[in-house]
């Protein structure tokens, strides 16, 4: 999936769909984080956006099931779909993670975006990926993130189920000093989601600093 700060692109699952349409375009609702759920629906409908990558503020995977069902019904009525979710909270508590996957299955979500605070959490997530057949994609948040360096991410995914891949944030990977296009190719088909944004990169106090910019105006 791709996001315009965040536009979002998701890679289709089948070879046939990849040939027909390499990516599907949508919007990451973090972009609309100052709006409530109903306003997000109105915005998407007004601008002809069908695909949403939803954040927990707009649909909480741990909310009461009746609330979740009601919000899904609103999306369905308005021709919208939550086809990805995240960045999702994860835990060493397997039951906590299971609820996230149960939510994703109910919503029809194909990819869950994650950024676990502990590498050991992947043991739980991998079991759920295999049980539910739902992909997860590891997000990067610059060099301050555990996953800011692509080498770390590659080391994780090469030893895990192929349904564990990457959410490549183009702005943040650029801010970390990497060539986004080169990194994309190096992941060799394991990029399942893209956050499309732009940043200019400056050196401040001997550190790389990424500053948000309009797409096409930055260094990404």
Where are these regions (language model features)?
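Short amphipathic alpha-helices and their capping/turn segments at secondary-structure boundaries
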Residues: 39-45, 67-74, 179-190
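A structural motif
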Residues: 49, 106-109, 191
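Active-site acidic/histidine proton-transfer and metal-coordination neighborhood
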Residues: 5, 11, 39, 58, ...
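Boundary/entry segment of secreted carbohydrate-active catalytic domains
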Residues: 11-38, 43, 49, 55-58, ...
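Glycine-rich, proline-tolerant flexible connector loops at the mouths of alpha/beta enzymes
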Residues: 53-76
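Acidic/histidine-rich catalytic cores of soluble enzymes
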Residues: 22, 51, 130-219
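Aromatic- and glycine-enriched glycan-recognition loops and surfaces
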Residues: 36-38, 63-69, 220
């Amino acid at each position: 999936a791709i996001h315009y700060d965040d536009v979002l692109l998701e890679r289709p699952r089948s070879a046939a769909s990849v040939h027909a349409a390499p990516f599907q375009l949508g919007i990451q609702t973090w972009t609309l984080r100052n709006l409530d759920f109903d306003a997000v629906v109105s915005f998407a409908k007004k601008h002809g956006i069908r695909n949403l990558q939803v954040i927990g503020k707009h649909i909480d995977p741990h909310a009461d099931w009746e609330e979740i069902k009601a919000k899904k019904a609103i999306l369905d009525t308005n021709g919208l779909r939550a086809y990805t979710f995240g960045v999702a909270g994860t835990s060493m508590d397997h039951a906590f993670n299971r609820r996230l996957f149960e939510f994703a299955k109910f919503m029809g979500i194909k990819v869950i975006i994650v950024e676990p605070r502990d590498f050991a959490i992947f043991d739980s997530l991998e079991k759920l990926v295999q049980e539910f057949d739902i992909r997860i994609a590891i997000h990067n948040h610059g060099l301050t993130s555990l996953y800011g360096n692509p080498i770390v991410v590659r080391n994780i995914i090469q030893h895990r189920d192929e349904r564990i891949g990457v959410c490549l944030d183009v702005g943040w990977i650029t801010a970390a000093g990497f060539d986004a296009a080169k990194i994309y190719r190096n992941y060799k088909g394991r990029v399942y989601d893209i956050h499309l944004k732009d940043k200019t990169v400056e050196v401040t106090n001997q550190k790389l600093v990424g500053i948000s910019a309009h797409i096409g105006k930055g260094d990404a």
